[in-house]
Amino acid sequence: MDSGGGSLGLHTPDSRMAHTMIMQDFVAGMAGTAHIDGDHIVVSVPEAVLVSDVVTDDGITLDHGLAAEVVHGPDIITETDVVTEGVIVPEAVLEADVAIEEDLEEDDGDHILTSELITETVRVPEQVFVADLVTGPNGHLEHVVQDCVSGVDSPTMVSEEVLVTNSDTETVIQAAGGVPGSTVTIKTEDDDDDDVKSTSEDYLMISLDDVGEKLEHMGNTPLKIGSDGSQEDAKEDGFGSEVIKVYIFKAEAEDDVEIGGTEIVTESEYTSGHSVAGVLDQSRMQREKMVYMAVKDSSQEEDDIRDERRVSRRYEDCQASGNTLDSALESRSSTAAQYLQICDGINTNKVLKQKAKKRRRGETRQWQTAVIIGPDGQPLTVYPCHICTKKFKSRGFLKRHMKNHPDHLMRKKYQCTDCDFTTNKKVSFHNHLESHKLINKVDKTHEFTEYTRRYREASPLSSNKLILRDKEPKMHKCKYCDYETAEQGLLNRHLLAVHSKNFPHVCVECGKGFRHPSELKKHMRTHTGEKPYQCQYCIFRCADQSNLKTHIKSKHGNNLPYKCEHCPQAFGDERELQRHLDLFQGHKTHQCPHCDHKSTNSSDLKRHIISVHTKDFPHKCEVCDKGFHRPSELKKHSDIHKGRKIHQCRHCDFKTSDPFILSGHILSVHTKDQPLKCKRCKRGFRQQNELKKHMKTHTGRKIYQCEYCEYSTTDASGFKRHVISIHTKDYPHRCEFCKKGFRRPSEKNQHIMRHHKEALM
């Protein structure tokens, strides 16, 4: 057999001579492209073949005696300039063993949807493809390839593949009632709309009963159309056929209304120009195509199948995506199912698998549904909008509709229950709640405050509320004003933004500022690890004198029940006493000659003897007669009286006896990031207020110098507050209830409202 060619075999019940004559006439008319090989005619074609006008001597057309075994060509070739009878074998027939041709008479389309047009049934062992050539109203060709699947006693024909070559005209498709298990595929192509691009989605609605359809789903998700038609209704139309009107139309992407419609028309209604007005809104459906399908049920003679189909219902699942439609007509019967698929392209199975995976991933999200009673009195599943209570038949339309509620989409995660404040940040929400707490701080009497967070929806249709109640967080208070917050970072930010001008002494290690040099010196001990204060009763050491006093009061007070037998130490807990005894017995080897006290080294023992027994400080100051244990302590103390500046700044003439003060001086005066310079002395400053304060020293204004330290200022009130709060502790404003002193009347009033509120009532 030639490449690209095919072989046709003739099998007729007539005589051998008639066959030979017909074969010779046919070969002569093929102009050298065919020859006789035994009982077969071999036809060679390059790509495709169009077989027509095969007649006998009596002028009778041979419509099913011609068999095509192998024909190579494209999927489907449509030619409008050739005769209207013939067969174009599509790609689906190439794998078939036997093919049968049927030729229909040329007609104008008025008698196509009649009961007289019946597809013949052929009994074959496995599978038969029947190709029909149908002429449309405007002369266009529609090719129907029908498939008969064996498996029952009387096989019937179902439509296998349909090509609609023109969407401007109504296309008539004749299909036989299908046997369960067969597949119908419809392909539509628009030749006139190649240059038109549309972003709309295609939707298919098919009615398969005589009482109207119930549309349950639409959009990007499968839709179902229920049908309760019985076989008895089909018998009323002659051969049991009925006309199905199929609407294929374009819907705009932003349309979220209930769309679609189905209608059943009889043959007389179709020939008389049945109107579909009222079913679809023409103003909204820009592109509409109608396909009339004549469906014949040839299985009405089979009682067992008819009884089964009476109780079965058929459903259609339609998946719309872009300009490609994938739909399936599915039967609930456990033994049979009929599918109607509208697809575009060869790789249909791959597309369906990909869409099924996407649909499964999308179905993990839960959507609220509702069941209502439809116009036909049947229950209908809808998707309601929880904002405006509109109902939609698909999740896709509901998603598009939700875009009409931008306010809902822009809602914040956290919302204050006392005002209209909203935010997406938890920290901002807590800070906002703290502002309410500070305002109502005086009236607050309960111990805990409930922090209520706005409900977060589990889905756009959920109304579950989530409320969190937390305990009151630890508050960080500013020691210079009434500001307090639950975040340490916010407190540091507040100190830098509000009180940075009051911190001239800055730590060179961490950058923390202090008002006075003594505070900076105390702070620097946290970096150096120096602990100059040691307990006289134990080995406890600390960097702050106040901490030492607290330690002595709590650990070595007169009222402590547990006292050491070897030393005057007392403890408030028996375990601490036992720990002290273990340490005393195991490590203290230096015994005091005056008591049972033992020390770990000689210096501690000497300090014990001086402070407890002799009260003698061998190293005394010549100026103030203050005693010290070590000569180094006395030397450091003597520098205060002499006023000698031993630490000099390498950038200027500044001198000080304290190295920490020198560090603060260098950081605040000689750092590189000081854009503001004094025009007189060229001294640099980081902030404008510091430069302004410094300029007052050049104007001849009075400078207030502290007699206790190096603090100086031009502000009389600030100087007074400094002397009182740091040195004299002589506060002019004292509380009437606890005698606590304050620098300002406002501080005293705030103290009374906080601690003595009950006394005022």
From Swiss-Prot:
Subcellular localization, per the record?
A: Nucleus
Task: Mention one GO biological process in which this protein takes part, according to its record.
Answer: regulation of gene expression
Q: Which residue spans match zinc fingers labelled C2H2-type?
A: 383-408, 414-436, 476-499, 505-527, 533-556, 562-584, 590-613, 619-641, 647-670, 676-698, 704-727, 733-755
Q: Where is this cross-link: Glycyl lysine isopeptide (Lys-Gly) (interchain with G-Cter in SUMO2)?
A: 224, 235, 296
* Annotated segments matching region Required for transcriptional activation: 515-761
> Where is it predominantly found?
nucleus
Return the Gene3D superfamilies for the record. Classic Zinc Finger
Binding residue positions for Zn(2+) = 564, 567, 580
* Impact reported for residue 139 to E: In XLID97; uncertain significance
Q: What one GO molecular function would you report for this record?
A: DNA-binding transcription factor activity, RNA polymerase II-specific
Pfam families listed in its UniProt record: zf-C2H2, Zfx_Zfy_act
Q: Which GO terms describe its cellular component?
A: chromatin; nucleus
Q: In which tissues is it expressed?
A: Expressed in neural tissues.
Write out the transmembrane intervals: none
Instruction: Explain what the record says happens when changing residue 622 to D.
Output: In XLID97; uncertain significance
Q: What does this protein do?
A: Transcription regulator required for brain development. Probably acts as a transcription factor that binds to the promoter of target genes and recruits PHF8 histone demethylase, leading to activated expression of genes involved in neuron development, such as KDM5C. May compete with transcription factor ARX for activation of expression of KDM5C.
Q: Which PANTHER family match?
A: IP01015P-RELATED
Q: What family does the database annotate? A: Belongs to the krueppel C2H2-type zinc-finger protein family.
- State which disorder the record connects to this protein: Intellectual developmental disorder, X-linked 97: A disorder characterized by significantly below average general intellectual functioning associated with impairments in adaptive behavior and manifested during the developmental period.
Q: What is this protein called?
A: Zinc finger protein 711
Look up and give the organism this protein is from.
Answer: Homo sapiens (Human)
